[in-house]
């Protein structure tokens, strides 16, 4: 794994999960079910957890929703899922926590938006109630500031001061600074109200990639709180994936960011779990964490007019993801497995040798055979109509042989403890 220098932060414990610079970057997601439907919400949390989400946020926006949070927690516990639940509060959080104390106890973390808690003294009182409730229940809090719901009184105060200055800044720069000030001032208030520093996580979300990078660089330089990364709205499909990757990878490479969420707009028919998979793939391709064996495959060219290698690459990746629910327990360390599926002789043998297991399928005009390489050595040559089945059997046998109870992996002729990989 990559040993990037992380920005030093407090360590925030959220049930069995630690968020901070001494822990791996944590992936979280959010449900889109009606929280008042406890059964549907619990089932979606299960799906997100199965996909690899380590914390899940749920909307708590009404008495009906708040009254079901404890039931959702019970349903998850009954299914054997200890996934921490984050309550997303806006506008009326203090009232819901007061009327439904079991809701506050069942949640593992509260998300509070300073921009819509309320105005003036009344807003301060609401904020104070939520913070004190979190402290009494020993819960963590994410103070999450959003570009679209910034505290307008703070924004106006800072805009007025900027206009009165001898060298006024562009309004958008003042707005970015207001986001940061809102988060930091709210955290300071929370500490004064009795919430320990190691119970606070901050976020300042915007929708533009360059703005997010600028804001988080500045925020990270001015506090020691763990930071939650994500665009407010990344968008749909490839645009959302690219925008999230572009923003988060820059910050993560600089050691900024302790928990992430990929806010994709779901396409019709696409699974909610896609945002979890994208988050995992960002961290894994950067070498920051390993979640599932990865498949390296060539993009194809005129030498690979057959679609066989493309189909095999897809089949192998799907097979590995499906097996991980079992392998993760039986074969610790298997998530670091690297499999290559290549389409012709140009790069096929070389890439296959560099992978733990690789197969080089024949390109156009090449001999219809597919050599398989294991730990850099040519092991067998496959041919015929059952190449996919035979190759997956080799992968299965490799996993059983090299990972498991002894906690060791044979790699390039050496035996290496899994924890050192």
From Swiss-Prot:
Pathway: Isoprenoid biosynthesis; isopentenyl diphosphate biosynthesis via DXP pathway; isopentenyl diphosphate from 1-deoxy-D-xylulose 5-phosphate: step 5/6. SUPFAM superfamilies: Nitrite and sulphite reductase 4Fe-4S domain-like (SSF56014). Gene3D superfamilies: Dihydropteroate synthase-like, Sulfite Reductase Hemoprotein, domain 1. It is an enzyme of class 1 (oxidoreductase). It comes from the Bacteria. It holds the Pfam family GcpE. Converts 2C-methyl-D-erythritol 2,4-cyclodiphosphate (ME-2,4cPP) into 1-hydroxy-2-methyl-2-(E)-butenyl 4-diphosphate. This is 4-hydroxy-3-methylbut-2-en-1-yl diphosphate synthase (flavodoxin). The lineage of its organism: Bacteria, Pseudomonadati, Pseudomonadota, Betaproteobacteria, Neisseriales. The gene is ispG.
